[in-house]
């Protein structure tokens, strides 16, 4: 049998590193279909930190796409698992037959599914991408994204799968003995990316709570984002006093980020699509409820796991937030499907499906 090849077709260092390390530590030892990777970006020590994997790096999307297409044409039994598919050339190859549906398996990350960019280039490309998506052999995604995808592509097979968020299961009970009182701290957004709509989110938080809460905005990632960070800071200072606004411009290491999250009482995410599952998982693990946009289908995954969900359209106050905290504290977090290690079973099944080992 031909070994499955995994494709990280865009240079998204943080997520690519998370996926590679997860495969190296959790999957490669038990499956030959979890070892071969083609990745856009620089090695930056990844090969050394992932010795169980064979990783080929490419300088850009186009060079990787050309290599994938060549392999697909040379051997029609070769199957590919695309992790977050942001590479236009690969979509066009699927549409034109350069890659066959039986070769194309896609794990939806969120931004690769929704059509939120307003630029002319994107508006012209989206219809072609929708046509190509009808030809995918199988999609893997959250419950909410599967539901969203099935509305336009009901004939494409869909399987439940969660991004392998870096988590320590021993921390599942860390919030149970914490007392929450006094001024609330609200986390706004999961990164410095504009998709978080930080300014609109700050205005929404201010409309709900006024200048009575402390707002923390993590914007250390992506890099070279100083102008937008300053734009958000100035907009925030028009709404909140300086003591109640903390805009973080430096990237935090994982442990420091965990410490930051534990200081919060609420997460506020205004974006209208599924993203930031990693941050949501870490907040939920710490017993911190989240406010979501009703258009963000991840609420379906949360309610399926009996987790409280607050919406941006709700009338929020401290009593409602504290009640959500109490509800969340009563949930057995060791049973949540999108937590580590529970998502591992889904990955093992996904590998078997993509490799053709199970129907």
Swiss-Prot record:
A Pfam family it matches: Glyco_transf_56
User: What UniProt keywords are attached to this protein's entry?
Assistant: Cell inner membrane, Cell membrane, Glycosyltransferase, Membrane, Transferase
Q: What is its EC number?
A: 2.4.1.325
* Keyword Cell inner membrane applies: yes
GO process terms (BP): enterobacterial common antigen biosynthetic process; fucosylation
Principal cellular location given in the protein's record: membrane
Organism superkingdom: Bacteria
InterPro entries membership: WecF
| Locations listed in the record | Cell inner membrane
- What's an example GO cellular component term for this entry? plasma membrane
Q: How is this protein positioned relative to the membrane?
A: Peripheral membrane protein
- Record's catalysed reaction(s): beta-D-ManNAcA-(1->4)-alpha-D-GlcNAc-di-trans,octa-cis-undecaprenyl diphosphate + dTDP-4-acetamido-4,6-dideoxy-alpha-D-galactose = alpha-D-FucNAc4-(1->4)-beta-D-ManNAcA-(1->4)-D-GlcNAc-undecaprenyl diphosphate + dTDP + H(+)
Name its pathway: Bacterial outer membrane biogenesis; enterobacterial common antigen biosynthesis
In the record, the note on similarity to other proteins reads: Belongs to the glycosyltransferase 56 family.
Q: What is this protein called?
A: TDP-N-acetylfucosamine:lipid II N-acetylfucosaminyltransferase
